[in-house]
Amino acid sequence: MRYLPLTPDDRAAMLGAIGASSIDELFADVPAGARLDGPIAGLPMHASELAVERHMGALARRNRAAGDGPFFLGAGAYRHHVPASVDHLIQRGEFLTAYTPYQPEIAQGTLQMLFEFQSQVARLFGTDVANASMYDGSTACWEAIVMARRITRRSKALLSTGLHPHYRSVARTMAKYTRDVLVDGDPRLEPGTDWAALAGRIDTETSCVVVQYPDILGRIDDMTTLAEACQTAGALLIAVVTEPVALGLIKSPGEMGADIVVGEGQSLGVGLQFGGPYVGLFACKSKYVRQMPGRLCGETVDANGKRGFVLTLSTREQHIRREKATSNICTNSGLCALAFSIHMTLLGEAGLRQLATINHGRAKAAATELAKVPAVSVMNDSFFNEFTLLLPTAARPVVHRLAEQDILGGVSLGRLYPDTAALENGLVVAVTETVTEADIAAFAAALKEVLA
């Protein structure tokens, strides 16, 4: 469709219909100081396409790409290899949208994809059912807390100190406008989790306990005892998974009794992308399905007996009365969910296990080498592909000095917890299949030099 601008006669007719003499009269209520009068200051003149490409290329070169050198950043967003076939397939015109498949008769491909995505997430998390994706991991975590309140009719949520601080921040922001009371704190630099202590703090006002698995420091623990404590007290256990590749090796939260499992799916099929868009994962026990936010795609049979897919549950405020809705999620992360599903399909169960094994093996090798650096130790007694180093000095300046040598050597806890001095010597290091032996050796040598 061509854009045909209004003619002077069109404008005059419209102004006459509303009794205005000029377009400026429409903005009479806007203070003069807030109105734009003339060109925008500092905005360059238009340029040719080639000139714009060169300019944008020059700006892009000021950034450092993840693949330009040794890369050990993690803490919730991980650099994994994404097969070229993933991006190729999601760019097909039939799929290249994140929009809701409102009309099943013309959206069978999208609906089937979401159905398969749900099946994969439920199996990965060890739960009965999963929805068609959320915006990202942090918002999925908050939706789980709200869901627990609806189910238990209680308002206090206990957050593990090992929960990612960004997830805690999102929850605190949202809790300002709800009845939820959040109880949390900063982690301690010690091998074990705080899950045993959490179990002792559950009371009759507790709606849920939220733990991360593996947690922000890379620690892994068995949540079976905590799940039993929650069940005894009538609270729900929410498990947050920020690195789903780990579930190729370690036991799923659902197997250990978690009632709701949420997470971030970025590790599979989705690049780092400057922090987004990502894809939130949400799964739960079947008895809670009607309180689950978002949409649920189901399989059915049409009037002719043919297999088909539909939106089975969609308890969002656009579809039902607002006061009855479980969420207000609109267009969600459908395209990223497709990328996740394609990558999972390409891997298969054996491939995911192999990928997880490679990640863990390289992380063990890195931890061994880095622990040889004088005055450096590995805090964790268990980890998957991420662990915390204890340095003899504040980690944040060390990270900057490593970057000067083109090594992105992890995320300092001083950056994640700027107001907690007790954590400033901690450095969270992630090691995926993209890290080589040469990368590990370079990191260890550079760290030794920086700390000398």
Curated annotation (Swiss-Prot):
Q: Which domain of life is it from?
A: Bacteria
* Coiled-coil regions, chain positions: none
- Per UniProt, the enzyme's principal EC class comes to oxidoreductase
Keyword Oxidoreductase carried by entry: yes
Provide a Gene Ontology MF annotation, just one. glycine dehydrogenase (decarboxylating) activity
Q: Name one Pfam family in it.
A: GDC-P
Q: Tell me, what is an example of a GO biological process annotation in this record? A: nucleoside metabolic process
Oxidoreductase found in the keyword field: yes
Q: Which UniProt keywords apply?
A: Oxidoreductase
E.C. numbers: 1.4.4.2
Q: Which Gene3D superfamilies match?
A: Aspartate Aminotransferase, domain 1, Type I PLP-dependent aspartate aminotransferase-like (Major domain)
- Give me the reactions it catalyses: N(6)-[(R)-lipoyl]-L-lysyl-[glycine-cleavage complex H protein] + glycine + H(+) = N(6)-[(R)-S(8)-aminomethyldihydrolipoyl]-L-lysyl-[glycine-cleavage complex H protein] + CO2
Q: How does it assemble?
A: The glycine cleavage system is composed of four proteins: P, T, L and H. In this organism, the P 'protein' is a heterodimer of two subunits.
Q: Which family does it belong to?
A: Belongs to the GcvP family. N-terminal subunit subfamily.
Q: What does this protein do?
A: The glycine cleavage system catalyzes the degradation of glycine. The P protein binds the alpha-amino group of glycine through its pyridoxal phosphate cofactor; CO(2) is released and the remaining methylamine moiety is then transferred to the lipoamide cofactor of the H protein.
Which HAMAP family does the entry link to? GcvPA (MF_00712)
**NCBIfam families in the record, alphabetically?**
PRK00451.1
Protein's name in the database = Probable glycine dehydrogenase (decarboxylating) subunit 1
